[in-house]
């Protein structure tokens, strides 16, 4: 693993990723109830096997950020598995602070992004056979096996990460959990922040995290 922790005034950060195995449910158990007798679920996917499949979520911190040509390096167990390149599409050229970006294999792209109208979410599909308009059309893993993400700008300079299990927390993300930031997103969030942890009660694909309630107000002003 490349032990680089770029975090001071990070322009974009990792907010959440799905570590739930394809044959498991969030919080364990079955379709009717989690292992504790509750109903752990995702606010978008509901309670489904795999909790939506391979996906992760970023938050834009720097206002008017240009992500054209940036690179998302994905590691499992300390080994670089895949690099997903963002394209030069104009969508990436002027992102507002507080924007949520999800990258997933299964859900088709939804780039209907309009912060002025209250739509702060961009979803792009990275999968073999996807259209490749916004991101490299290549499948990628997300798992509970020391999964980490590193973000590089168009020049190849590391601007954040790697972040994930094995950095913070050091271990303990289970195959029935998500990894999430349990703090308000800001430029002070480091890749090794102690506010990164696992959760099995709820996940929030494309929305602010809930363990308490993540507040985007300081970014979306």
Where are these regions (language model features)?
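A recurrent domain-boundary module in secreted/ectodomain proteins
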Residues: 1-6, 198-221
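Activation on beta-sandwich/Ig-like modules and their edge loops
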Residues: 6-146, 152-198
């Amino acid at each position: 693993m490349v032990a680089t922790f770029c975090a001071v005034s990070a322009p974009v950060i990792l907010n959440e990723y799905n570590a739930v195995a394809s044959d498991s449910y969030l919080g364990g158990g079955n379709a009717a109830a989690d292992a504790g007798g509750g109903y752990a679920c995702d606010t978008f996917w509901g309670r489904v096997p795999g909790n939506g499949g391979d996906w992760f979520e970023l938050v834009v911190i720097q206002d008017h950020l240009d992500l054209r040509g940036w690179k998302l390096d994905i590691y499992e167990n300390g080994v670089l598995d895949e690099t997903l390149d963002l394209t030069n599409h104009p969508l990436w050229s002027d992102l507002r602070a507080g924007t949520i970006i999800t990258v997933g294999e299964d859900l088709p792209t939804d780039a209907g992004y309009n912060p002025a109208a209250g739509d702060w979410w961009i979803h792009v599909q990275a999968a073999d056979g996807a259209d490749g308009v916004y991101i490299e059309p290549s499948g990628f893993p997300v798992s509970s096996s020391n999964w980490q993400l590193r973000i590089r700008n168009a020049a190849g300079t590391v601007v954040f990460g790697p972040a994930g299990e094995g950095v913070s927390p050091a271990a303990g993300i289970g195959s029935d959990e998500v990894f999430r930031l349990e703090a308000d997103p800001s430029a002070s969030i480091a890749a090794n922040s102690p506010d990164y942890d696992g959760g099995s009660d709820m996940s929030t694909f494309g929305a602010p995290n809930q363990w308490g309630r993540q507040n985007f107000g300081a970014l979306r002003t």
